[in-house]
């Protein structure tokens, strides 16, 4: 019998084992769709970004007008830009839901997969930050100034580090040029990391909603889950195109319609919505270095989750106390996001501080305690 090319060809074999004949747990729910959605988000962002880069000029005098030119004079330039800007929001919605799923179902016990995932999140955050600076509007400029300035809180080398990153004594042309270079490079690095992420995942196989071993009941990825993924793509692209076509500036800051001016500070400097939770944590500490450390810890704490898993069960499916704690954490993150968008004044300061304290308490203290308590209640 002639060998099946799909299974024998070195390259096709790789694709086959990842996307066609991959043994997949039969009971994975729609929460397992977000990995492929992130892949399609990345592809969309790279494609639209490449088309935008062909019309963009990385120069402080021309950047703003080159973006305006793309929207006004380039065929469908407005659409490409709106898809790219709002695509970033959908990328973050998907990654946050993906992390939430991993957290709820104990997927973090695949340590290598989880750790590469956290690195992917950090790379995505860096990409989004440098990308936001490129249109060179007011919020782009001041966002870049404020966030890069945080590195000056690092003792001894801080100031040198910031000036090295800026390429001068303030955010200027060299900064914009290198941010464009980084924004172009990082998505390809993310693609490489995603491949590593998948390699580690396929080493152990997917987790499932019950958090139990599923080797006895697996089905091929194609056609079952390839079809389910396509449905996911449609469900994601519908709101994305709706947003890009009907309300493209809904999630943006009106301040960014004003060209960057180093002499005028915007009344409220705030990042895009997907960074607001971390921004609220940063602002809640009245000390610069302390704030920077808390900001870093707010994301880096994810590296610790596998070590803080004390339950004898993997998923939270049958752990009502942990579920309660999980949804409290979700609500807490929404409160932090809201506080981050508000000005720094009376009720918001204390709410932000309490929510920041609650965030770290739930993750570092309450989850392990409740996990151990549930073991005791179930006589494990």
Curated annotation (Swiss-Prot):
Keywords recorded for this protein, A-Z: Electron transport, Heme, Iron, Membrane, Metal-binding, Mitochondrion, Mitochondrion inner membrane, Respiratory chain, Transmembrane, Transmembrane helix, Transport, Ubiquinone
Gene Ontology CC annotations of this record: mitochondrial inner membrane; respiratory chain complex III
Main location: mitochondrion
One protein family per Pfam: Cytochrom_B_C
GO MF term list: metal ion binding; ubiquinol-cytochrome-c reductase activity
Keyword presence, Iron: yes
Positions annotated to bind heme b b562: 84, 183
Cofactor comment text: Binds 2 heme b groups non-covalently.
Membrane topology (UniProt): Multi-pass membrane protein
Subcellular location: Mitochondrion inner membrane
Sites where the protein binds heme b b566: 98, 197
A Gene Ontology BP annotation from the UniProt entry: mitochondrial electron transport, ubiquinol to cytochrome c
Membrane-crossing segments per the record: 34-54, 78-99, 114-134, 179-199, 227-247, 289-309, 321-341, 348-368
Residues given in the record as a ubiquinone binding sites: 202
Electron transport keyword on record: yes
Xref: Gene3D superfamilies: Cytochrome Bc1 Complex, Chain C
Cofactor list: heme b
Other remarks on this protein: Heme 1 (or BL or b562) is low-potential and absorbs at about 562 nm, and heme 2 (or BH or b566) is high-potential and absorbs at about 566 nm.
Assembly mode: The cytochrome bc1 complex contains 11 subunits: 3 respiratory subunits (MT-CYB, CYC1 and UQCRFS1), 2 core proteins (UQCRC1 and UQCRC2) and 6 low-molecular weight proteins (UQCRH/QCR6, UQCRB/QCR7, UQCRQ/QCR8, UQCR10/QCR9, UQCR11/QCR10 and a cleavage product of UQCRFS1). This cytochrome bc1 complex then forms a dimer.
PANTHER family per UniProt: CYTOCHROME B
Function: Component of the ubiquinol-cytochrome c reductase complex (complex III or cytochrome b-c1 complex) that is part of the mitochondrial respiratory chain. The b-c1 complex mediates electron transfer from ubiquinol to cytochrome c. Contributes to the generation of a proton gradient across the mitochondrial membrane that is then used for ATP synthesis.
Family label: Belongs to the cytochrome b family.
Designated name of the protein: Cytochrome b
Source organism of the structure: Uria lomvia (Thick-billed murre)
Lineage: Eukaryota, Metazoa, Chordata, Craniata, Vertebrata
Gene: MT-CYB
């Amino acid at each position: 019998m002639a060998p099946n090319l799909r299974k024998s060809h070195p390259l096709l074999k790789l694709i086959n084992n990842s996307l066609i004949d991959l043994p997949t747990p039969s009971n994975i729910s729609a929460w397992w769709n977000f990995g492929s959605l992130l892949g399609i988000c990345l592809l969309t962002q790279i494609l639209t970004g490449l088309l935008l880069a062909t019309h963009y000029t990385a120069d402080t005098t021309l950047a703003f007008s080159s973006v305006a030119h793309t929207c006004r004079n380039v065929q469908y330039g407005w659409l490409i830009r709106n898809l790219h800007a709002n695509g970033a929001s959908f990328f973050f919605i998907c990654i946050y839901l993906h992390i939430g799923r991993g957290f709820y179902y104990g997927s973090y016990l695949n340590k290598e997969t989880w750790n590469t995932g956290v690195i992917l999140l950090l790379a995505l955050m860096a990409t989004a930050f440098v990308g936001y600076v490129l249109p060179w509007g007011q919020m782009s400029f001041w966002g870049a100034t404020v966030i890069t300035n945080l590195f000056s809180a690092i003792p001894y080398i801080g100031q040198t580090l910031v000036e090295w990153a800026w390429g001068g004594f303030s955010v200027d042309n060299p900064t914009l040029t290198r941010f464009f270079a980084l924004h172009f490079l990082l998505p390809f690095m993310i693609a490489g990391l995603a491949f590593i992420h998948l390699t580690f995942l396929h080493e152990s196989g997917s987790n499932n909603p019950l958090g139990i071993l599923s080797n006895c009941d697996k089905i091929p990825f194609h056609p079952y889950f390839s079809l389910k993924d396509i449905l996911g793509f449609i469900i994601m692209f519908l709101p994305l195109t709706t947003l890009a076509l009907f309300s493209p500036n809904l999630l943006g800051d009106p301040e960014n319609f004003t060209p960057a001016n180093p002499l005028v500070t915007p009344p409220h400097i705030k990042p895009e919505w997907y960074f607001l939770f971390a921004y609220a944590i940063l602002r809640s500490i009245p000390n610069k270095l302390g704030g920077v450390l808390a900001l870093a810890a707010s994301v880096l704490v994810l590296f610790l989750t596998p070590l803080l898993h004390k339950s004898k069960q993997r998923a939270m499916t049958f752990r009502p106390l942990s579920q309660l704690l999980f949804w409290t954490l979700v609500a807490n993150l929404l409160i932090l996001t809201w506080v981050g968008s508000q000005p720094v004044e009376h009720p918001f300061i204390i709410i932000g501080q309490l929510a920041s304290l609650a965030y770290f308490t739930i993750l570092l203290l309450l989850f392990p305690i409740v996990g151990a308590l549930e073991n005791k209640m179930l006589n494990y």
